[in-house]
Amino acid sequence: EFCRVEPSYTRKLKAMLLFLAGNIPYEVNISKLASYLEISKNTVLSYLDSMKRAELLHLLYADNKTVTKMQKPDKIFIHNPNMLYALANQCQIGTVRECFVVNQLSARHTVEYGKSVGDFKIDGSVTLEVGGEKKTFDQIADIPNSYILADNLEYPVGKKLPLWIVGLNY
C-alpha cells in the first residue's frame, strides 16, 4: 500500500496517467481532471503526488519555495519521454523535447515552470526556452542568464545550446 490506493481505484490511476500522457504538457485544471475521472479534487492531488513519488510524473510549479503538499502543480510532464511513446497515441516533438529537458535537469537541479517567461527556470536563476533549431530569442530577449535549448543543433552558437547537451548532466 505504497500509495494508499484502494485496489478498486487502480483503473482510475491508469486512466489518469493515460489522460495526462495524451495531454502533456498539461496545464493543470484539477476540477476538469476530477470530473473526467469521477473522483474528488483531493483524490486527484493525492494521486498526482503518488505518481510523482513513483517517478511516473514531474509536477512543476512556478515557485517551488511556496509549494504545499495539496497544492495543484502549474504543469505536469510524464517523467520519462520514452513513456510518452508507450502511453500516448501521438507525441508532439515539442512535448518530447520539454519532457527530456525536465527529466534530465531535475536529476541534479530544481526545475520550475517558467509561467510568464521562458519554458523553465533552473535553480531559480537560469531561464530556458526549448525548441527546434530555428527557435528565436523573442520570448526571452531581455531576460538575463537565459538560453535556448535547440533540437537538431550540433554545437553551441552563442546562447543557443544543443538540446542533447542536457543529457550530459545526468
Map each language-model feature to its residues.
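Domain-level recognition of nuclease-like catalytic cores that cleave nucleotide substrates
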Residues: E154-Y170
